[in-house]
Amino acid sequence: MLTIALSKGRILDDTLPLLAEAGIVPTENPDKSRKLIIPTTQADVRLLIVRATDVPTYVEHGAADLGVAGKDVLMEYTGQGLYEPLDLQIAKCRLMTAGAIGAVEPKGRLRVATKFVNVAKRYYAEQGRQVDIIKLYGSMELAPLIGLADKIIDVVDTGNTLRANGLEPQELIATISSRLVVNKASMKMQHARIQALIDTLRKAVESRHRS
């Protein structure tokens, strides 16, 4: 049995057509089904529907053989039991700092609100900047508006939400897209099967990119 971990939303919607190229099609609509384990048209392949931030955990610990996760999630994840063989070039966005429009950056310690705590620590450590990291799980845009933080680090797509709340994108930390991740033990035990799937997905990605 080959188990693939996916999260609902944009990543799932963009991944399903790629899996279809490999003949893997869910037997139920994952967006409408309440099931978290979904069979596919290949009897020995199933999909796990999990939270986006949990995909690497399921894969590293062998609950799933493969998964699809955003590079932002993988940058924040601290585990080591994963291969990242393929950039699927889907769900593209940017991981950026943002702050109030026209605000002057403080000269002392910077207060940064984010759910990407590990990313923030590495980013500012590389700059030699002293910062206080404030972990939030959502509504990041509020933090600078009410004085909780000087800046935020968050995923930015169009930037419209930032601008609607009086903020502006500032420094680019990373360009994000979704990646295929593979459990290291699964890659050894089911190498031929998984490598064939990787090769098929790579061809599908390249074909899309050319068109």
Swiss-Prot record:
Main location: cytoplasm
PROSITE patterns from the UniProt entry: ATP_P_PHORIBOSYLTR
CDD domains registered for this protein in UniProt: PBP2_HisGs
Highest rank taxon of the organism: Bacteria
Family listed: Belongs to the ATP phosphoribosyltransferase family. Short subfamily.
Annotated domain remarks: Lacks the C-terminal regulatory region which is replaced by HisZ.
NCBIfam families noted in UniProt: hisG
Function as written in the Swiss-Prot or TrEMBL entry: Catalyzes the condensation of ATP and 5-phosphoribose 1-diphosphate to form N'-(5'-phosphoribosyl)-ATP (PR-ATP). Has a crucial role in the pathway because the rate of histidine biosynthesis seems to be controlled primarily by regulation of HisG enzymatic activity.
Name of this protein: ATP phosphoribosyltransferase
